[in-house]
Amino acid sequence: MDKWKRTLDTPEGSLGYVVEAGQWIRITDYSGTDIELRIPEEIDGLPVRVLTKKTFLSRKHLHKVILPDTLEEIGDWAFTYCTNLESVWIPKKEMKLGNRIFMECPNIHRIYTYEPGVARDDFGRKQHGNRTSEKQQESRKSEEDQWAALLAAATLMLDAEYLVNFTEAGSVEWIRKWDARMNGVLDMDDSEGYTRMILCGEEDYGTNIDEFIKNKRKSKVRLALLRLMNSIGLSAENEVKLKDYLISHTKGCASEESWEVLLKEYGHEQEYFQLFADIGGINEQNFDAILTDMSAEYAEMKAFLIRYKAEKMESTDFFDSLSLDSL
């Protein structure tokens, strides 16, 4: 008798829901312009247990969502086409998961899991007691951020729904499975899938074989950068493999996808340039050409590279004719 749709106001919109059997809540849909959204644990005194199919379909304003620890099911395509969604907090528990719940969410960078019953702040973070030092909190945060990034990449980069496991995420075994899938992607021939794409009329990588291969390499570069930036549990063997891949496609190589991705997609992020320089992607041989590629838009990063070369690279002859004022 309670099965009619009701609404709950949010700061900038509303959640649609129904009461099931007079005992629990099913969220049916959302409309509005909230950037950050916390789904309540209870509505009308009843636990929120289910996000139905397509609950947040194509909600472009959403950037962050925190799901309640009462949740037991997330339906098919629940967040599909949420193109600006960046992070989600999900309870670390067994639950029924539908198909492709984060399909076509190109900007989802982190999927966090949290222990049910642990107090959270407004952004989903754990609230630590006073006895926990700032250093310990930062260490926890760093590890949590790393495997949250890997969990998001399982769906975004690896197309591995079996890795979207909220109870195992971050465990040694889960990371082993993640890296096994990563290696499968990296080892795949760059031309694999081209014929199928043409026959099926898909255009994700372009219709020219050279363009297809180039974009395949770029996707591998993104994957390698992400794993090195989130290196929790990374074996020495895999670390070498990732670095070698990036170096083999840097500026001055037969193909330069590593440098192209770094400049165009991470051109204002110093930590990525630091990583790329540290592994040898930026070196004495290609330094001049790299600076030439960097327009005035990247003046800050050019200055960083000049300082880096002065401090870390052996030869300083190059700087006899350079100054920061010339940027």
Positions of the model-derived regions?
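Short amphipathic alpha-helical segments and helix-helix/interface helices
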Residues: 98-102, 273, 302
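Charge-dense, extended regions
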Residues: 275-281, 286, 291-327
